[in-house]
């Protein structure tokens, strides 16, 4: 067989920022990024360029500009650009990064691995590291049991989304902590550090579709110095299987507090289960516009305790105002369903109270008031139902 042509074979190596245009068929190695390229051009080629060869070091998601939203199941491809001929094209990496998962940051969710650092890292990187709006996105918690042995600090503007109560579970078991989860400012600072530096106090935090559980006797969710926050379709529980017969360490499932600097206001719970603790909810400090709607309070010494420790000084000058519990269910509560020691405009409306304030002896054994407004003005029970004979 006659030899028609012998082509020159040449390889180059160097750093990626000094990679020249390679000759047609010439191979170049970028030693710093460990990526390999081959030159393309000349007759028959659509353009002169360096093409990357896929290796174990290639970032396929970054280099693949192949995603275009279509939604073909509706019967036609959606138009994403100015016209059908110019669709919006994004890399797969950009598409996947639209939603962040705690597993992207190392959380496992197997109930055995300590996920504290991984979850706090995810919260910091997405919501606290840079105060740029476009960096924020929903933080997704796939179904699993996330063991935490330290305090989870949820910064301002965080949006946490699980796959439903008893499917996504955050489980805290460190008795030395002040809570399993606590709201933090925009720099992930808590307690006396809230608002220091350029930190914005806790605000517009959303938690949706998960269980937050304490396996030890500590508060479960601590909402402190916060404004305009929403907890939807969640279980917030301790570790009591039945209503405690004493206050114990007086820890609540939900603890809401203020300081002299920041008064908590406009906190909304919707369709949540709260209890299995000494108290379901403890509200002592000055605060206003606290609303529980469609919730289930169960297995507690008292379901909701309001304004017991009013001192006349900040942060507990007069106690909570405008606390409303509506369309909710109270069940297996040893003492009062609602006990307002101090506070104005406390309202219970259209709730049902089952086996409440009977010392767990059944509805024919009343021990105290189901609803007790001890002091304050403008407090009412409207349209409530009771199972007492």
Which stretches of residues belong to each language-model region?
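All-beta strand scaffolds that present successive hydrophobic residues in beta-strands
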Residues: 141, 159-163, 202-208, 229-233, ...
